[in-house]
Curated annotation (Swiss-Prot):
Family per record: Belongs to the NAD(P)-dependent epimerase/dehydratase family.
Name assigned to this protein: UDP-glucose 4-epimerase
NCBIfam families tied to this protein: galE (TIGR01179), PRK10675.1 (NF007956)
EC number: 5.1.3.2, 5.1.3.7
InterPro entries: Epimerase_deHydtase, NAD(P)-bd_dom_sf, UDP_G4E
Organism: Caenorhabditis elegans
Length: 349
C-alpha cells in the first residue's frame, strides 16, 4: 500500500514513516514545517526524514507542501496514486491555540477539509486521523474508554479542532460507506527512536513536559515549573498517560494492517495509551535517574483547565488492532535522554 503522510517531518510523523517503511508500506511525505524545525539539506529535504532513510535503508520521498494550499495539494494527488492517508499535520500548541484561536480553527480545519475533498475526488478511501485525548475534555470517568463522553468542556481551540475533525470524518464515513476511517486518540507521546537519530525537536520553548524536562537536564533551560502540586494524586502533581512515540507510531501501522486484512471496517476509534498514569514528579524522577543530572523545579499555580488525572483504557486497540504499548517508563526516559544528548541542538546541530 502507498500511503500519503501529512506532517511527516515532525516528531510523530518521522517515527510513523519509519515504522510504515519497516512494515513494507511505501510513503510520500509532506510537511510545511509549521511545528517541526525547518531543517533541510541543500535539496530541501527534511533532515528528520533523511535520518529515517538512513535507519531503514529505504527511499523516503518528501515534498514541502502546505495542506492548506489546495492547488499544491491537488498537484500531489494528481501526480500520485495513494491507497491511504495518515493525516498528522496540524498546529498543536494548546496554549497558543487559546491566544490565537482563529489561526488554529482556520489552519487545522481547512487543511483537513482540503485533504478529505482530495480523497473524494481521487478515490482514496482509507483515512487514518491523528486525534487526541483532548476530545474527551475533563474526564467524566477513569480510565477513559472510547465510549467516554467527548466534546464537553474542551478547554482550548486545539482540542476543539480535533473534536470537530472527528465529527466531520464520522459524517463523511457515513455518507461514503466504502470508506475506512480510523480515529486514533493519542495520549501523551514521549521518548525517541532507540538510535537517537530522530526525536522531538520543538520550535522555541517546548510546550510538552518531557522535552522541557530534558532541556533543563542538559542545561538549555534553567528550571522546570510544575503547575500545581495539590491535585488529588499520588504526590499532588498532575497524572497523565505517557506513551512511547515508537509504540504510538506502530498503532498507525496496525490500523492499515487491519484495513488490509479485514477490508471494509467503516469508522473505528481507538485510544492509544498505556493505560497507566504517571505524575509529573514521577516523570522528572525517572529522567533524573537515567540522566544522572539534577533537574531544578519550582511550583507554579495550576493552569486553567488542568485536571488531576487523565489515563485511558487501551484494551480495544489490543483486541481489534492487535496493538499494545510495550515500553515502560524508564525506557521512555532513557530513549529521550539518548536523543537529547546526541542532539543537544536538535536537528540543527
Amino acid at each position: 500500500m502507498h500511503i500519503l503522510v501529512t506532517g511527516a517531518a515532525g516528531f510523530i510523523g518521522s517515527h510513523t514513516v519509519l515504522e510504515l517503511l519497516n512494515s513494507g508500506y511505501t510513503v510520500l511525505c509532506i510537511d510545511n514545517f509549521a511545528n517541526a524545525i525547518s531543517v533541510t539539506d541543500e535539496h530541501g529535504n527534511a533532515i528528520s526524514l533523511k535520518r529515517v532513510a538512513q535507519l531503514t535503508g529505504k527511499d523516503v520521498p518528501f515534498q514541502n507542501v502546505d495542506v492548506c494550499d489546495e492547488a499544491a495539494l491537488e498537484k500531489v494527488f494528481s501526480e500520485n496514486k495513494f491507497d491511504g492517508i495518515i493525516h498528522l499535520a496540524a498546529l498543536k500548541a494548546v496554549g497558543e491555540s487559546v491566544a490565537k484561536p482563529l489561526q488554529y480553527y482556520s489552519n487545522n480545519l481547512v487543511a483537513s477539509l482540503n485533504l478529505i475533498q482530495m480523497c473524494l475526488k481521487y478515490n482514496v478511501k482509507n483515512f487514518v486521523f491523528s486525534s487526541s485525548a483532548t476530545v474527551y475534555g475533563p474526564p467524566s470517568e477513569l480510565p477513559i474508554t472510547e465510549k467516554s463522553q467527548t466534546g464537553q468542556g474542551i478547554t482550548n481551540p486545539y482540542g476543539q479542532t480535533k473534536y470537530m475533525m472527528e465529527q466531520i470524518l464520522i459524517d463523511v464515513g457515513k455518507a461514503n460507506p466504502e470508506w475506512n476511517v480510523v480515529l486514533l486518540r493519542y495520549f501523551n507521546p514521549v521518548g525517541a527512536h532507540k538510535s537517537g537519530l530522530i526525536g522531538e525537536d520543538p520550535k522555541g520553548v517546548p510546550n510538552n513536559l518531557m522535552p522541557y524536562v530534558s532541556q533543563v537536564a542538559i542545561g538549555k533551560l534553567p528550571v522546570l515549573t510544575i503547575y500545581g502540586d495539590q491535585f488529588d494524586t499520588v504526590d499532588g502533581t498532575g497524572v497523565r498517560d505517557y506513551i512511547h512515540v515508537v509504540d504510538l507510531a506502530k498503532g498507525h501501522v496496525k490500523a492499515f494492517d487491519r484495513i488490509k486484512t479485514v477490508g471494509n471496517i467503516g469508522t473505528e476509534i481507538y485510544n492509544l495509551g498505556t493505560g497507566v498514569g504517571y505524575s509529573v514528579r514521577q516523570m522528572v524522577d525517572a529522567l533524573k535517574k537515567v540522566s544522572g543530572r539534577d533537574i531544578p523545579v519550582k511550583i507554579g499555580v495550576p493552569r486553567p483547565g488542568d485536571v488531576a488525572s487523565v489515563y485511558c483504557d487501551p484494551s480495544l486497540a489490543q483486541e481489534k488492532l492487535g496493538w499494545r504499548a510495550e515500553t515502560g517508563l524508564e525506557e521512555m526516559c532513557a530513549d529521550l535522554w539518548n536523543w537529547q544528548t546526541k542532539n543537544p541542538q536538535g536537528f540543527s546541530a
